[in-house]
Curated annotation (Swiss-Prot):
It comes from Shouchella clausii (strain KSM-K16). It is an enzyme of class 2 (transferase). Catalyzes the formation of 6,7-dimethyl-8-ribityllumazine by condensation of 5-amino-6-(D-ribitylamino)uracil with 3,4-dihydroxy-2-butanone 4-phosphate. This is the penultimate step in the biosynthesis of riboflavin. Pfam families: DMRL_synthase. Keywords: Riboflavin biosynthesis, Transferase. (2S)-2-hydroxy-3-oxobutyl phosphate binds at residues 86-87, 128. PANTHER family: 6,7-DIMETHYL-8-RIBITYLLUMAZINE SYNTHASE, 6,7-DIMETHYL-8-RIBITYLLUMAZINE SYNTHASE DMRL SYNTHASE LUMAZINE SYNTHASE. This is 6,7-dimethyl-8-ribityllumazine synthase.
């Protein structure tokens, strides 16, 4: 029987980069807090968590690429909030950010986690940043921990 690979939720020793869009900061700051809390509660050292703030969601893939290619991180988490308005701008931004982040996960050799909220309303964003629907920053941190540990297993 072949090997079974599975990532574990142990963050001790992991170096994690987090890219956060400043636009809608009243939401993204809560996502960041959730991600940092999730990493630390799973054993990460505060000194092993670096944060890069960018103007908005559209700039996230660039900073995430720089972090991922630096060789300093076991995983990169991307956090942002895009809330639908009355123009098609929402669709353009969401599509490009999602494509950019997913391509980094496939090309850089380290997990790049998509934690960008794309909601129809401010209320939906608030719910996903720590109220009714949990904190998607925390969930992104959990995914980053698991995927970083899974990736390390393939290097052994």
């Amino acid at each position: 029987m072949g090997k079974n690979y599975e990532g574990h939720l142990v963050a001790s020793g992991l170096k994690v980069g987090i890219v956060v869009g400043r636009f809608n900061e009243f939401i993204t700051s809560k996502l960041l807090g959730g991600a940092q809390d999730g990493l630390i509660r799973h054993g990460a050292d505060e000194g092993d968590i670096d944060v890069a703030w960018v103007p908005g969601a559209f700039e996230i893939p660039f900073a995430a690429k720089k972090m991922a290619e630096s060789g300093r991180y076991d995983a990169v988490i991307t956090l942002g909030t895009v809330i639908r308005g009355s123009t098609p701008h929402f669709d353009y931004v969401c599509n490009e950010v999602a494509k950019g982040v997913s391509s980094l996960a496939l090309t850089t050799g380290i997990p790049v986690i998509f934690g960008v909220l794309t909601t129809d309303t401010i209320e939906q964003a608030v719910e996903r940043a720590g109220t009714k629907a949990g904190n998607k920053g925390w969930e992104a941190a959990s995914a980053a921990i698991e995927m970083a540990n899974l990736a390390k297993q393939f290097e052994e």
